[in-house]
Amino acid sequence: MLDREGYRPNVGIVLLNSRNEVFWGKRVGQHSWQFPQGGIQHGESPEQAMYRELHEEVGLLPEHVQIIGRTRDWLRYDVPEEYLRRQNSTRVHRAAYRGQKQIWFLLRLVGLDSDIQLRAFEHPEFDAWRWVPFWIQLDAVIGFKREVYQLALSELARYLSRGMRMQQLAWGTPLDLFQSFYAGNEDQSKSSEKSDK
């Protein structure tokens, strides 16, 4: 199901734990990591699709999560032609298909980590997972999705604690904040390693 511009409706899911860390899933047989996501089927609302995808990819049920917020509008990314040529998908007519348009949901896990089951379905999307900081560096995400991830995280950050939002305003964009924090921690650990010698 494509819209008039060639985008497939889709949902993206940012799942938080109690420490505001996010679920990060490793694609089966690949070295790329991503948030859960999936297509909206005919007749489904974005929320219904989100719950279905959450169950299919992560094994969670509606009672395991609380919806905190969602993006106001669709966020789009184009899939590069060379990537489409490598796929053997017959579901989407390549001549018309441009990419995905996504509504992103921010969820809080109210269940347990043990409720996460990557093999809930016969064909799992992920073969490993971990909790990572909200402002995760996106190098492990396939290149053409990175901008949409930055947009989604930036928009969904408004639902986080006031303290995190104030840091964002004081120190630039959320990604700038994370990268400066990450770089600062690397510098500190290098200097402490040197002083230990």
From Swiss-Prot:
This protein's record includes keyword Hydrolase: yes
EC number assigned by the record: 3.6.1.-
EC main group: hydrolase
Keywords of the record: Hydrolase
Cross-referenced InterPro entries: Nudix_hydrolase, NUDIX_hydrolase-like_dom_sf, NUDIX_hydrolase_CS, NUDIX_hydrolase_dom, RppH
One Pfam family linked to the record: NUDIX
UniProt superkingdom: Bacteria
GO MF assignments: pyrophosphatase activity
Coiled coil feature spans: none
Domain Nudix hydrolase: 6-154
Cofactor: a divalent metal cation
Motif Nudix box: chain residues: 38-59
Protein purpose: Accelerates the degradation of transcripts by removing pyrophosphate from the 5'-end of triphosphorylated RNA, leading to a more labile monophosphorylated state that can stimulate subsequent ribonuclease cleavage.
Assigned protein family: Belongs to the Nudix hydrolase family. RppH subfamily.
Protein name, UniProt field: RNA pyrophosphohydrolase
